[in-house]
């Protein structure tokens, strides 16, 4: 299956107080905890400008800024940039602040890829998880439309797509895997969730 991992690391991290992607947790940057659990495929990192040097120093080669015309427009801008610049059928889009996700969950999610849907999104504890989801390349026109219409919420995009919702039971996932980190005290000291 033709899939590229897309890690979104372009946010301002206002509540966290510093860039989350580079925050050291248990001896390595937060983004590395996420990256090691993604599909065994190429990973493209969509970076905040202030982190470009950091990622390059960590040996990351596929690190891009959002395309200039959509820079600052949130996750949709990152998805747009990845789809415009890296050809693939599917994109596993994830945030850099979900360090408890498991590769098994990513693999289970990818097993639902089908030509009959545009996106495969987990539903965990009654909430959609659009920032750990698979999007087909054919979503690009809908993403472009959302950006042009200044509809920047993920729910705006989801309403335009044929979506396969996958429950946490179908993924054999735990709800804690999908916790995103907004403040330092969201990270347990011992790494256990």
Curated annotation (Swiss-Prot):
It is found in: Cytoplasm. GO terms for cellular component: cytoplasm. It catalyses: Mo-molybdopterin + GTP + H(+) = Mo-molybdopterin guanine dinucleotide + diphosphate. One of its GO terms (biological process) is Mo-molybdopterin cofactor biosynthetic process. GTP binds at residues 8-10, 20, 66, 97. It is an enzyme of class 2 (transferase). Its cofactor is Mg(2+). Mg(2+) binds at residue 97. Keywords: Cytoplasm, GTP-binding, Magnesium, Metal-binding, Molybdenum cofactor biosynthesis, Nucleotide-binding, Transferase. The keyword GTP-binding applies. GO terms for molecular function: GTP binding; metal ion binding; molybdenum cofactor guanylyltransferase activity. Transfers a GMP moiety from GTP to Mo-molybdopterin (Mo-MPT) cofactor (Moco or molybdenum cofactor) to form Mo-molybdopterin guanine dinucleotide (Mo-MGD) cofactor. HAMAP family: MobA. Belongs to the MobA family. PANTHER family: MOLYBDENUM COFACTOR GUANYLYLTRANSFERASE (PTHR19136:SF81). This is Probable molybdenum cofactor guanylyltransferase. It comes from Bacillus pumilus (strain SAFR-032).
